[in-house]
Regions:
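Glycoside hydrolase catalytic-domain context in secreted enzymes
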Residues: 1-619, 623, 637-641, 646, ...
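A broadly tuned "polar low-complexity/structure-edge" signature
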Residues: 40, 71, 247, 357-360, ...
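Terminal connector regions
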Residues: 618-665
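Charged, amphipathic alpha-helical linkers/stalks
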Residues: 646, 653-723
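Extended non-globular C-terminal regions
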Residues: 721-806
Length: 806
């Protein structure tokens, strides 16, 4: 392995600067003269997406075959970090086989609002659960010599305007909700890299945010790896390098190199800043390349498919089972209805889309099972178009069966990178079908496919509801076995399912197209809000049924944790997920009514009992004191609550905890709405009290960060024309039921990304000329663009000639 210190002495400043940006869409720069290899980076979080031909960052072009595991949102329902580690190891093995050094995942965004179109890529609304699962994935991936790259750091909760939105969040909420998952992942998973998010956080882009990248990530958590930009996510490359950003991707060309050289010359940054970033990048390059050179070029596809199936089994959640309709008895005459039974929906759209090695089909698995499948009907148009003939045929088939298996869900474009959902509803034609089929045969099992929450006002029309989530390429076999009892579904929800979307604290303002995204609800996302506000939900966080039952007893507790006995009181084997929550009554702080602090899985045979221990760590009682600017503990009496869900608390013990807090964080500040959890409509005044400063102005500016979707604000006919064309194309794609992801990306893309995504064809100087044009300086802007274009071509050619020998 190369000695980084010696290598830094050999490299010229220009060569050093060149190494800090990519060469191609998914490749870093190599310098053979200095023995520095080029390495591959690749999506994705639940399956490798290495494109053999022309590469893109949106999943538009085909990739090499790989195993598609259940999405993070599905695996989270298993509450099994060890399973995550197994999946991670398989992902790492496939990445190594394809010579990929950095795998871009897992996703750790907090599920602030279920309309986020990319929720299927993320684990949970709870940072502790998300962090534990992510740490497992990271350990698994890196066990194969491949670097994991958890993402998107940080406070990135919507796809709308994702490259230029400013997340306005108070420091306590930032620390306790949006950073804790990353903290756990970094400290317990030790990732070699981490991906910064597109957005700003409190006025500064995440990728150049010293508070995030240096003070917290490196100084507090001890991270010593590489920070990699999201694709096209660099704003000020020099400031990013100074404040902790290591590698700019994908391929900004020579302009990025010249930006760093000019910054060193002007004193904006120093060569030691460049060296510090290379000291993070080069060990990753050499270590992963050496591991990959020794790795096999093949993997056991059958074994990985089997793992994907087991993961899908553990991730199934039984949400309803009226009259114990499930499991279905062998020989039962069943009608299979629904397009998803024949054409599976098993993954989301966008950069995580995998070209699966194989895909199981539920209808085929049911036909091969012990059930008597009397027929199949499509039942509904997948994309929502009403079809009376399909519905009529389905009802006729249902009337002949002992039971109906009805497969419902969201279609492919409903959940995607680059696009937020418009509502939580299933297509009306599916709901109409369910109601019609229920009139013909009430014994209905709904198998539901989605990557996130859906509203279920139709729940009374079915006797059983099995949530299959997005179960990956082997999910169909898991569902079939669960329906007949070969598998006992024991998963539990990793996010709250509300009665209606309007019940969610951020509902009124999501997903805003304003520049500022105001996190007015503070700590109260997911169950933290619903339990504090005592608001009813459809299915609570941590909820899930089973074909058996469990009893909890004999709890003992202290500051280190709890122990208790769990007994399988039913007639079949099963796995229980025991959850430990912490609550503090009469707190001097505002805080959620209860918070998850650990959990345990226990698998028991009928009648078997087991004593389990659940430990508490350094995060159990802490809060971020905004006045003292540190983690502290409020002393006093706490309740340790053990339950089968956040609402189904079985056992409780009180303990006394010694405090460390020396100053009240909100002394003389009236935050009554936060103490009561009344955060559905937080006033400007109350939010400013929480922030400790005025709410930033979100007014649109015509500058490098103006998005193409905001060109209607331009003072130029050219800008209006581009905006009009993009808007029309977007509207047409929506009306067709297939929004164009490429157009959506462009619509939400800031002008500066033109210089970051075009492999050097467009420079930032050319972007500045375009900005002048849009500001109304038409002739000067055009002259600037032409001048900068010529200059860019000449300078790029000169630089590449110098670097070619490197």
């Amino acid at each position: 392995m190369q000695n980084t210190e010696l290598l830094l002495k050999e490299l010229t400043l220009e060569e050093k600067c060149a190494l800090l940006s990519g060469a191609e869409t998914f490749k870093t720069r190599g310098m053979p003269k200095h023995g520095i290899p080029q390495i591959w980076l690749s999506d994705g979080p639940h399956g490798l997406r290495k494109q053999a031909g022309e590469s893109d960052h949106l999943g538009l072009n085909p990739s090499v075959p790989a195993t598609c595991f259940p999405t993070a949102s599905a695996v989270a329902n298993s509450w099994d970090a060890a399973l995550g580690e197994e999946i991670g190891a398989a992902l790492g093995e496939e990445a190594a086989a394809q010579e990929v050094s950095v795998l871009l995942g897992p996703g750790l965004n907090m599920k602030r609002n279920p309309l986020c179109g990319r929720s299927f890529e993320y684990f949970s609304e709870d940072p502790y659960l998300a962090g534990k699962l992510a740490a497992g994935y990271i350990r698994g991936i890196q066990s194969k010599g491949v670097a994991a790259c958890p993402k998107h750091f940080a406070v990135n909760s919507q796809e709308t305007r994702r490259m230029a939105s400013d997340s306005i969040v108070d420091e306590r909420t930032l620390r306790e909700i949006y950073l804790t998952g990353f903290e756990i992942a970094v400290k317990e998973g030790h990732p070699r890299s981490i991906m910064s998010s597109y957005n700003l956080v409190n006025g500064t882009y995440a990728n150049e945010n010293k508070h995030l990248l240096m003070e917290i990530l490196r100084d507090e958590w001890g991270f010593d790896g590489a920070v990699i930009t999201d694709w096209g996510g660099s704003n000020d490359h020099a400031l990013g390098v100074k404040n902790g950003s290591t590698l700019e991707m994908p391929a900004p060309g020579g302009d990025s190199v010249r930006e760093l050289l000019a910054a060193v010359e002007s004193g904006k940054i120093s060569e030691s800043d460049i060296d510090a970033r290379l000291s993070e990048l080069l060990p990753l390059v050499f270590d992963t390349k050496a591991a990959l050179d020794a790795a096999p070029r093949e993997f056991d596809a059958a074994a990985h498919h089997a793992l994907a199936r087991r993961a899908a089994e553990e991730s199934l959640v039984l949400l309803k089972n009226e009259g114990s309709l499930l499991p279905l008895a062998a020989g039962s005459k069943v009608a299979v209805i629904g397009d998803f039974a024949k054409n599976p929906r098993y993954q989301g759209a966008g950069s995580s889309m995998v070209n699966s090695t194989q895909v199981d089909v539920l209808l085929d698995k049911l036909i091969d099972s012990e059930l008597n499948v009397i027929g199949y009907q499509q039942g509904f148009d997948r994309h929502g178009k009403p079809d009376a003939a399909l519905q009529k045929s389905a009802c006729e088939l249902a009337a002949q069966a002992n039971a109906v298996i009805l497969c419902m869900g969201l279609d492919e474009i409903a959940e995607s990178e680059g696009l937020d959902r418009s509502n939580l509803l299933l297509a009306q034609n599916q709901v109409d079908l369910l109601q019609a089929v229920a009139a013909a045969n009430p014994k209905i099992v709904v198998v539901l496919y989605s990557g996130s929450v859906v509203e279920t006002p139709w729940l009374d029309n079915c006797q059983a509801l099995l949530y299959a989530a997005l179960g990956g390429q082997a999910g169909a076999g898991a569902v079939a076995d669960a329906l007949i009892g070969k598998v006992n579904p024991c998963g539990k929800l990793a996010e709250t399912w509300p009665l209606t979307y309007a019940d969610i604290p951020s509902a009124a303002d999501f997903a805003t197209r304003r520049k500022t995204v105001e996190y007015r609800e503070g700590l109260y996302i997911g169950y933290r809000y619903f339990t504090t506000a005592e608001k009813a939900v459809r299915f609570p966080f941590g909820y899930g049924m089973s074909y058996t039952t469990f009893a909890y007893s004999d709890m003992a507790a202290d500051e280190q944790g709890v122990s208790l006995t769990v007994t399988n009181t039913g007639s079949v084997a099963g796995t229980e997920i025991v959850q430990l929550y912490v609550a503090k009554k009469n707190s001097e702080l505002f805080r959620p009514a209860k918070e998850l602090k650990d959990f345990a899985r226990v698998t028991l045979a009928p009648g078997e009992k087991q004593r389990i221990t659940i430990m508490l760590d350094d995060k159990a009682f802490r809060f971020w004191n905004v006045k003292a600017n540190r983690w502290e503990i409020e002393g006093g009496e706490y309740e340790l609550l053990v339950g089968a869900s956040v609402e189904d608390i079985r056992l409780c013990e009180k303990i006394s905890v010694h405090g460390t807090a020396t100053v009240h964080p909100y002394e003389d500040v009236d935050l009554d709405c936060y103490y009561k959890g009344n955060v559905l409509s937080v006033s400007d005044a109350d939010f400013e009290k929480l922030l400790g400063h005025p709410i930033p102005n979100g007014k649109t500016k015509i500058d490098r960060n103006l998005t193409l979707g905001e060109l209607n604000h331009a003072r130029s006919p050219l800008g209006w024309l581009v905006w009009l064309v993009l808007t029309i194309l977007l509207d047409v794609s929506y009306k067709r039921g297939k929004p164009d992801l490429n157009i959506l990306f462009q619509y939400n893309m800031p002008l500066r990304a033109l210089a970051k995504m075009t492999n050097g064809a467009i420079s930032m100087g050319m972007v500045d000329g375009i900005v002048m044009e849009l500001q109304g300086f038409w002739i000067l802007g055009l002259v600037r663009v032409i001048y900068e274009a010529i200059k860019n071509v000449v300078l790029n050619a000169q630089m590449e000639k110098r670097l070619r020998g490197a």
